[in-house]
């Protein structure tokens, strides 16, 4: 996904 890597 993407929602899990939004923490950048």
From Swiss-Prot:
Could you share any additional remarks the record makes about this protein? Answer: Is a major component of C.dorsalis venom.
Location(s), subcellular? Secreted
Q: In which tissues is it expressed?
A: Expressed by the venom gland.
Gene Ontology terms, cellular component aspect? extracellular space
Chief place of localization: secreted
Asked if the keyword Secreted belongs to this entry, the reply reads yes
Query: Do the record's keywords include Secreted?
Result: yes
Write out the entry's keywords from A to Z.
Secreted
Superkingdom per UniProt? Eukaryota
Recorded protein name is Peptide Cd-125
């Amino acid at each position: 996904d993407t929602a899990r890597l939004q923490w950048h």
